[in-house]
From Swiss-Prot:
<dbReference type="InterPro" id="IPR011332">
    <property type="entry name" value="Ribosomal_zn-bd"/>
</dbReference>
<dbReference type="InterPro" id="IPR001705">
    <property type="entry name" value="Ribosomal_bL33"/>
</dbReference>
<keyword id="KW-0687">Ribonucleoprotein</keyword>
<dbReference type="GO" id="GO:0006412">
    <property type="term" value="P:translation"/>
</dbReference>
<dbReference type="InterPro" id="IPR018264">
    <property type="entry name" value="Ribosomal_bL33_CS"/>
</dbReference>
<comment type="similarity">
    <text>Belongs to the bacterial ribosomal protein bL33 family.</text>
</comment>
<dbReference type="InterPro" id="IPR038584">
    <property type="entry name" value="Ribosomal_bL33_sf"/>
</dbReference>
<dbReference type="Pfam" id="PF00471">
    <property type="entry name" value="Ribosomal_L33"/>
</dbReference>
<keyword id="KW-0689">Ribosomal protein</keyword>
<protein>
    <recommendedName>
        <fullName>Large ribosomal subunit protein bL33</fullName>
    </recommendedName>
</protein>
<dbReference type="GO" id="GO:0022625">
    <property type="term" value="C:cytosolic large ribosomal subunit"/>
</dbReference>
<dbReference type="GO" id="GO:0003735">
    <property type="term" value="F:structural constituent of ribosome"/>
</dbReference>
Length: 55
């Protein structure tokens, strides 16, 4: 019912290195309305790379 317009939805963060590796996290839509970008570890390339929010 109200799951679609949740304030803190579950999002996928996909690696920009092109490996297809993803993290799953939650974000607050009120504080961060734009797409989230985080620097996290990608075990496929064994480096820290940018992970972008996938829609």
């Amino acid at each position: 019912m109200a799951k679609d317009k949740d304030v803190r939805p579950i999002i996928k963060l996909k690696s920009t290195a092109g490996t297809g590796f993803t993290y799953v996290t939650r974000k607050n839509r009120r504080n961060n309305p734009d797409r989230l970008v985080m620097k996290k570890y990608d075990p496929v390339v064994r480096k820290h790379v940018d992970f972008r929010e996938e829609r």
